[in-house]
Amino acid sequence: FRQVMQTTVFTLASAKALTQSRRLIDTQVQLKEFLPALRKSSWISLDTEADSLHSYPEKLCLLQISLPDTDVLIDPLSQIDMTALFKALASRELLIHGSDNDLRLMYAAQQFVPSKIFDTMWAARLLGFTAFGLNDLLSKLLGITLDKGSQKANWTRRPLTDKMANYALNDSRHLRALTDQLRDQLKSKGRTTWHEQICNKLIRDHAAPKETDTGQAWRLKGSSKLS
């Protein structure tokens, strides 16, 4: 595999001198101003954050979107109407890492189902990577090490700290470069079709979510042997 030997600790703040207020979209006006750039963008990568560690059921707390020239955070907790946003996303290929949770959150929030995704985690698994977390892949393939200090943060917190904002944006902004490398490797190994089939199944599964069987949800393998 092609690797970059020099590892760099990367934070968004050191790469782009943006204040949080400029990269956080939490009003209808800001969202409307952002949509033209989204619609004409040559690619779109995204990630989400939820409050699963602090409440149940979990809900979508943050949507991170990266385009060639910008990275933004969109705040669903601000009660903005995201209908136009998801309509714009629906017809595009979305670059996502480990899309299962993201797709579930976006469906629950807006009944959103994308038409096409490229899941970098599943690409790595098909290529035989034994460590396929985002940080693992970025380090191995791009020489980038991310600060994961906000991994267990409370994403309902407002305002977001700079550390939280940087953590969130870093999860989406490198996905295009990672996708390019993984897509090339899938093609060279003849596994592109397999990956497309997996991504399509992920989309189908979230387009028709199954009702939760509350009894089944609490059954554990071997639980009948407990006393």
Where are these regions (language model features)?
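Mixed-charge, glycine-rich, non-catalytic linkers/tails in nucleic-acid processing enzymes
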Residues: A165-S227
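An N-terminal structural lobe/cap that precedes and organizes the functional/catalytic core
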Residues: D51-S66
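Active-site-proximal helix-loop-helix substrate-binding element of RNase H-like nuclease domains
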Residues: T7-A17, S21-L24, L62-Q64, D69-R176, ...
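Active-site flanking loop/helix segments enriched in acidic
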Residues: A50, R158-P159, L220-K225
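N-terminal accessory regions of nucleic-acid-interacting proteins
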Residues: V4-I44, T48
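Ser/Thr-centric signal marking residues that sit
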Residues: T48-A50, T120
